[in-house]
């Protein structure tokens, strides 16, 4: 089929299958694939048929090739709907680049100064929110000939399009979010939770948001690899087999105790059972710091649900990880939204064979949020818990697994007890036994200022023999027999005393004998 200059070709005429959206490229050598618009700009004639509108992009008659759907290959990662504004990589290289993440990480004072330097008036800046300042800075940058790059987690809305949400903003919708078109989502097989990095363009007339122009990477890898990934639900779950080493410094007794008596592996589903004021937040911080120090290959996310704002700030400054939060003054729908985005993001990374750890504080408050937002079923359990409300929190917690095909998702969640709320007790009972590792904190130990306030007798890991060596297992079994007749307070005091005298756990186990512990 020959196409003359200016001819608009319909989808039916090209023989396209229904569902291939936004593009069919025609070339005189019949060698062009989907995604090569900008490579031919100004030299040949390309005719593109999109769902939204038809347009001719270049200047010469071309031959149309009908291709089967499976043969399509994506060579250029641009948005077909923006083909006429797409720039070559050579054009982009010589222009000023600006990364949105650099702006979102700035404090308000620094961002205001930066905006004023870019030509935005001081009077306008002082009354704007942070997201609005970023929006105007970006718009000013593009008007001056610069290019913008952005990254974020994709949230696909029911209408088929999506937005890149910023983790610095805890995935809250804002005016600086990046629009991702339905054609791009279908073209690259994108899902909610995908971490996308690429070039964006400023809003056109009548548009409110910046839009994705060219996708560079998906989940920190090339776009081509997205087509080969296996869905998370189709991956094979296994028991954890690789230990997360939590031992850092000699004086960090908490993580040393966990390393011995309740080791955590990649893919662990761990529950920290904690009454109020037993040091669970400090314990979570120490776990997070140990993981970032000993396992830089692990992607760590700290998810704080219904927490106090000052605790969020403390966690952000203490832990070198991605901290996502929804404080107690937010609505329950907000708690649910960020929990689901974080889970989807973790799943996408596991599909790319990465190791992910989520520290959740707390699963009790997440279950409370679901209880408020789920439609009532008419069946109410003791404490006011709806029978359907715990399904999604269980699905969140149950997503933790070691994957046979590669990668793992570890979830370490806290469960609140002894709060005086019957609902919290019911939620804990529902989650009791669902994990494969449990740490019990004891209020009596914390009242005596004994930290870590861990009840050694009640804490442990299923299949710990997969994480420990044979020698370690034998010595720990002997140690448990020795301390079994003791009170919890005596056990913790003994462990603190003996561990402080040894450099690490290996030296502690070597020096261990019944005579030493009886002295």
From Swiss-Prot:
Its EC number is 3.6.4.-. Belongs to the Rho family. Gene3D superfamilies: Nucleic acid-binding proteins, P-loop containing nucleotide triphosphate hydrolases. Signal peptide: none annotated. The keyword Zinc-finger does not apply. This is Transcription termination factor Rho. PANTHER family: TRANSCRIPTION TERMINATION FACTOR RHO. The lineage of its organism: Bacteria, Pseudomonadati, Spirochaetota, Spirochaetia, Spirochaetales. Keywords: ATP-binding, Helicase, Hydrolase, Nucleotide-binding, RNA-binding, Transcription, Transcription regulation, Transcription termination. One of its GO terms (biological process) is DNA-templated transcription termination. PROSITE patterns: RHO_RNA_BD (PS51856). Facilitates transcription termination by a mechanism that involves Rho binding to the nascent RNA, activation of Rho's RNA-dependent ATPase activity, and release of the mRNA from the DNA template. The keyword Transcription regulation applies. It comes from Treponema pallidum (strain Nichols). GO terms for molecular function: ATP binding; ATP hydrolysis activity; ATP-dependent activity, acting on RNA; helicase activity; RNA binding.
